[in-house]
Amino acid sequence: MSHIPVDKGGPLTPHQDLHSEQGALRGEHPGRAQNPVIKVADLAWLEFEKPDLDRAEVFARDFGFAIAARTQHELWLRGTFAGSPCMLIRRGRASRFLGPAFRAAERADVDRLAAAVGHGVRDIDVPGGGRSVALFDPSGLPVRVVHCAQPLPALPEQPPLTLNTGTEPRRTNATQRPPREPSRIQRLGHVVLETRTFARTLDWYLDTLGMIVSDFLFLDGQRGRGPTMAFIRCDQGSLPVDHHTLALHLGPGTGYVHSAYQVTDLDAIAVGGEYLAERGYQRSWGIGRHIQGSQLFDYWRDPDRFMLEHFADGDLFSCDLEPGWAPMSASGLAQWGPPVTRDFLGTSPSPAKLREVMTALRGDNELDPARLLGLMKAMSS
């Protein structure tokens, strides 16, 4: 088998100079389901449990969230865009990720999905009210599909800087002095999840929620065994959407890796990063620009060690673009920026990580010694 040929002298193909010149080989995963149950419109919010809501709120404000609602037991965070909240944090004994909630395109989709899986529809106590159906993906992660009755109104934006570019000067007799303040979050962009059952979990999101793949990554020398990472977007037809709303990758763990939140521009990322650093928070990796998705990025750890990303200027794809295919490597994570850190890759050795690997290798899943060695090679290449 050989790669799909690309004619450098002809018109651009969907993979030439767009996101990957390598399309699928014959018989490889198509990256979408023919007849999904529904097609979700976007991520709605992410749900966490934490013991200290006061500390969580301090970080949230420093990171750039606005507070949508606060009770003794719940903290709802939001961005400036109109719509649903970005995050729900419930008070609990331990810090843990509870799962994502996806936004249904219309209320009838919640009922249709509930009927298809045999689950009930329930009211949800979200600002503005709404309805939801609760599911589990093949990894065992709780997933909700929701429809909010009343969207939150928009909040004031952090305006982008007016830039002088080449022969198009737009700013004269004025200086650039962006204030040292939090990067004002606009919206939730995506969540990245790790799973030991990559193939089954991927197919579940495509079959059940109607999502489609933008890019596949595969391990060196193991392409014939299928991909080990997928960047997945929502299918809204001709309407351009984020390159990925969800990313899945094979690994020894199960659950949350990081989540990403859009801000105005590069200066908002940089100044917000300075603000976080001055307050003693840990940068995990950044600032740089990704390859898959093209986002400008900056990754930070919250006080509970969860990783969150500020991003701007990401790719937008319509439903027409077919998946790209590329080898997985640490050096392939960014077009430019500082070297990727061990903290970001999760490769720092620890007793907990060793137990996680041993448990995965003994279990009935897709992580075998060859896959593990391939992942280790990718993270060092």
Regions found by a protein language model. Name each.
Residues L77-A82, R91, L135-P138, I232-Q236, ...:
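Active-site beta-strand termini and strand-to-loop segments that position acidic
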Residues S2-D17, I38-S84, L193-V241:
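Core segments of cupin and vicinal oxygen chelate
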Residues R32-N35, M87-L88, R177-R180, H244-H249:
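Short beta-strand/turn micro-motifs at beta-sheet edges
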Residues M1-Q34, A41-P51, R91-A115, G118-R184, A230-F231, G280-S381, ...:
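Vicinal oxygen chelate
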Residues A199-G288, Q295, P303-D304:
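Structured core of small recognition/catalytic domains
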Residues P153, L161-L206, F216-F218, G224:
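Non-heme Fe(II) oxygenase catalytic core, chiefly the N-lobe of the double-stranded beta-helix
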Residues R26-G120, I124, G129, N365-S381:
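The feature marks the first
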